[in-house]
Amino acid sequence: MPHTPDAPLTLYATARCGYCRRLKRAMDQAGIGYREVDVERDAEAAELVEYINGGYRLVPTLVFADEEVLVNPTVDEVRAQLASMSPTPSVAPGR
């Protein structure tokens, strides 16, 4: 499920980042889909990551569909954020 264009999260990374490779491997093994953007090849993405991180190009940076941001998270933190985004089933009144 990795590298999914319409995934609920975007992974900003670099090819030579060991933390990025570790996180991608863990998300791949967990079946978590994501869109990957290499900040060394995409100047706009690099600017966004620097803006998010107070002027620093910190990777891996994950941006979720609800605009929540995690920097160098564990796969468990990614799962928790995805779970918090899942819609809660509504219960009809009177039930």
Where are these regions (language model features)?
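Thiol-based oxidoreductase modules, predominantly thioredoxin-like and allied folds used
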Residues: I32-A46, Y56
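Local sequence-structure signature of Cys/Sec-based thiol-disulfide redox active-site neighborhoods
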Residues: M1-G33
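Short amphipathic alpha-helix with an adjacent loop that forms part of the alpha/beta core around
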Residues: V49-N53, L82
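Non-catalytic, surface beta->alpha helical segment in thiol-disulfide oxidoreductase systems
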Residues: F64-G94
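Structural micro-motif
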Residues: N53-L62
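Short alpha-helical
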Residues: G18, A43-E44, R57, E77
